[in-house]
UniProtKB/Swiss-Prot annotation:
Sugar-bearing residue positions: 51, 80, 101, 113, 127, 135
Organism ancestry: Eukaryota, Fungi, Dikarya, Ascomycota, Saccharomycotina
Gene that this polypeptide is encoded by: FRE4
Provenance organism: Saccharomyces cerevisiae (strain ATCC 204508 / S288c) (Baker's yeast)
Name of the protein this chain belongs to: Ferric reductase transmembrane component 4
Signal peptide: 1-18
Residues that hold NADP(+) according to the record: 519-522, 685-686
Biological function: Siderophore-iron reductase responsible for reducing extracellular iron prior to import. Catalyzes the reductive uptake of Fe(3+) bound to dihydroxamate rhodotorulic acid. Fe(3+) is reduced to Fe(2+), which then dissociates from the siderophore and can be imported by the high-affinity Fe(2+) transport complex in the plasma membrane.
Cellular compartments annotated: Cell membrane
Protein family: Belongs to the ferric reductase (FRE) family.
Keywords: Cell membrane, Electron transport, FAD, Flavoprotein, Glycoprotein, Heme, Ion transport, Iron, Iron transport, Membrane, Metal-binding, NADP, Oxidoreductase, Signal, Transmembrane, Transmembrane helix, Transport
Amino acid sequence: MLLVHIISFLLFFQLSAAKAPPSKTSLINTHERRSIYSCYVGLRKETWGFNGSAICRYEPAIQSMLYCLYEDTHEKGYSNKTLEKGFEEMRQFCYTPKFLNMTDAEFYTSLDNGTYYIQDQPKAGINITYPIRLNTTLRKAYYDAYYGYYYNHDIPYYFGGIICAYFVGVMLLAGLIRFLNYTPIKKIMFQQKLVNYVRGYTTLPTLYEKHAEPFSYLKVITGYLPTRFETLVILGYLILHTIFMAYKYQYDPYHIIFAAHRAEVAHFVAYRSGILSFAHLPLIVLFAGRNNFLQLISGLKHTSFIVFHKWLGRMMFLDAIIHAAGFTNYYLYYKKWNTVRLRVYWKFGIATTCLAGMLIFFSIAAFRRHYYETFMALHIVFAALFLYTCWEHVTNFSGIEWIYAAIAIWGVDRIVRITRIALLGFPKADLQLVGSDLVRVTVKKPKKFWKAKPGQYVFVSFLRPLCFWQSHPFTVMDSCVNDRELVIVLKAKKGVTKLVRNFVERKGGKASMRLAIEGPYGSKSTAHRFDNVLLLAGGSGLPGPISHALELGKTTAASGKNFVQLVIAVRGLDMLNACKKELMALKGLNVQVHIYNSKQELASAEKISSNEVKNGETTAEKAPSSLSNSEKAPSESENTELPLSLNDTSISDLEFATFHVGRPNVEEILNESVNHSGSLAVVCCGPPIFVDTARNQTAKAVIRNPSRMIEYLEEYQAW
């Protein structure tokens, strides 16, 4: 990723070094501007003596303009202060040395002289050598026409701002609810039946029984469905966007500015869709970034912001298509297509739209899942090119501020990311192969203040020639043995994790490697604020919940009033071996540990009946596309023949834990936890189906127990 970051930086640097500064956006629907332009349109059709139609150079024409401005101003109830703003508008309109040097007093003198000699507008064809008064009906029609034109110019900026404010408002509301965690108000609120019915039916559950697990239609269309909460946020945004695209266009029934209603509609719709498209840029860049201040405020997962990022990108592209189609129709009507298509801004507009389409096309779930590194490289390069073409498209028009904001957000995110990496430097990590496909990574911390909270994650770059530019997310734990060490457990899949696993295997099962670690990311969990905590861990999603168990067990052991249960679902003993030190640290703590092994080992467990829930496989590495794939467990022979694993975990080592053969029944376990008095937090990280089951069962428990405070805290992330 380092190379594509350099390319994107160079493109952004080129933007800042442009030959001429781009035009600033200004709101133009002011009385003085409407009046000046409407008066000009009415007066330019007259035949002025001596100077023809040169209104700004012929005194009677100038006096007529000033009188028209005066009538419009006082007719609308404005004061002389507004009239003087009209004088300034006329200076800029004519923009000659004479006008630029005229004082307000000189404007008033010219107006007084013109008023003294003013006459009614004559019939057409007469050579005019005196100031005239425009026909009142026509003057008002011209004024209204320009009011509509400038209104349609300005209103999209307000609409774009409202869309940004909508998402900021949602995040502030989520942040307020998060703040209530530190007050007794939330406990009272979450014990209200109405509140819990709303939570159980609308905000907690998945949309169609799936969220972490990707949906598939005809094995071609795949992707991740949002949760119901995310769906509500997206639905609110789509409703707003639809209203803003369809609401309150001001049309001119007299066709003073546009020759036909078709041209007027095409122009207004195209302009509005273009501004709304650009208004999405800051949010799109912000939501894709790792250092998103709205994520810090709201406490929402990065996964949720990626969902919003995708939908904003899709609607931005739709707006761009409408924008392009509208202006194409407009110029075809005026028969200017062959001329305008050769202009530079038009060519950059086409390039911008094509790049937006490519960004979306190469972001489909199937492509991300199978070619994630290619997707990331293309996405960054296309995004940089997209912003560059956007810049060139509007450099002589308006809307550049949206691009300024997007680039500023991108730049701040990169600076913070570099700072995070610098805090740890490039430490050398000890890598140890566990079983056939797990690698335990131990990293010494050079800084004492660097601490990973339970459930947090880091982005790791393995500094090897074949993969140093790649950056992948992994759950991180502070070592329970040495507080100056970090621990990461990764599962080898495809790509970089497979390269790392093969490297360690070639080194005899143990190796050292330089890493670049960026993080930690993710907010501190609120699980410690609940009376009871149920920790559900599946597969290689164990590190997060086990970190919670270690912290909760230490803080609650003295009081003994809390019920903390850690439920671990594994296939074989490899994951237990990888986290053996952390598991052994639970001994003597106030944590009930239940381990479900769905793969029967030859000499490791008694046979205990258990109910089933569908099982998949996940990983502490939250790889954006690969998390959705179920992975086959290695065969028993693979486990027993590999000489590179740690000493096998045995029943005697974990005598404090209760072992089960089979898969955990999440519903039954959850119902048992609900029976304990007090509030309950359910923390889950595991295979996609396991996570979705836990989410939906928790939502049902909230509905069944509307007077209890039950919260679901999910640590699984996929994008």
